A protein has these predicted regions:
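Flexible coil/turn residues that form the inter-helical turn or adjacent wing/linker of helix-turn-helix
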Residues: 63-64, 84, 209
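Alpha-helical DNA-contacting segments of helix-turn-helix folds
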Residues: 92-102, 106, 144, 164
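Amphipathic alpha-helical packing segments from all-alpha helical-bundle domains
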Residues: 105, 153-180, 187-191, 218
Length: 233
């Protein structure tokens, strides 16, 4: 095939254009990779601070742990701490939210493996999984139980815990909507359940008083069922 001068110019232009397009795409990909590395590095530092705070809060206690203790143990500069947290109370708040989300995530994953159709049974299964996790880790219980309130449940546990990017509150509302029932003040209902579970299990798990966890469960779960039934319209 014979090319004219104009054909050759067009071919040369396309070669330059293709090379430039490839260069632009490559540069964009490099920028995206760099951004991902930056985000991963930021998350790594934040996780290091959270994990260190958890270790120190549970070993030394919240009051005896300083921000300097946390950053020194985590191996980051003090200024880095303030990039992620306002103060010591803020890191505890976020730490409780993170640990609580992990517990609920595991409970919900276990629920998905079961064939449980009724809302009451689904909620009690989740509660049972949460109690089991806290019973197996009293240190974690000490950190989150006294702070696992309705406000924490609704406003702080925003980290997605399933493939649909739903958080704990979203999942609770979906379970309600799929229950086949309408509920009177569902937020009041879950508030009462959370407060009852947190309050009644704390001393039972830590001291075994007035009964063991296994002895408490039937009474606790019956109370949960009654709360749910009283809210069905």
């Amino acid at each position: 095939m014979v090319y004219t001068k104009n054909d050759q110019k067009s071919i040369n232009f396309l070669k330059v254009f293709d090379f430039w397009s490839f260069f632009v795409i490559l540069k964009k990909m490099k920028g995206e990779i760099t951004m991902k590395k930056v985000e991963l590095n930021k998350k790594k530092k934040q996780d290091a601070l959270l994990n260190t705070a958890y270790q120190l809060f549970t070993e030394k206690g919240f009051q005896k742990t300083s921000i300097s203790d946390i950053v020194n143990e985590a191996g980051v500069a003090k200024g880095t701490f303030y990039l992620y947290f306002k103060d010591k109370l803020d890191i505890r708040y976020k730490l409780i939210a993170k640990k609580s989300a992990e517990v609920f995530k595991h409970a919900y994953q276990e629920l998905q493996k079961q064939s449980i159709d009724h809302f009451e049974d689904q909620l009690i299964f989740i509660v049972d999984q949460v109690i089991g996790a806290l019973n197996a880790n009293p240190t974690l219980l000490k950190l989150i139980s006294k702070h696992l309130s309705w406000g924490m449940f609704k406003n702080s546990l925003v980290e997605p815990i399933d493939d649909a990017q739903r958080n704990i509150y979203d999942i609770y509302m979906d379970l309600l909507n799929n229950s086949g029932h309408e509920f009177d003040h569902p937020e009041v209902m879950i508030y009462m359940i959370i407060e009852m579970v947190a309050g009644s299990c704390y001393n039972v798990i830590l001291t075994g008083e007035p009964v063991s966890v296994d002895e408490l469960k039937p009474y606790l779960y019956q109370s949960i069922r009654l709360i749910i039934q009283n809210h069905i319209l």
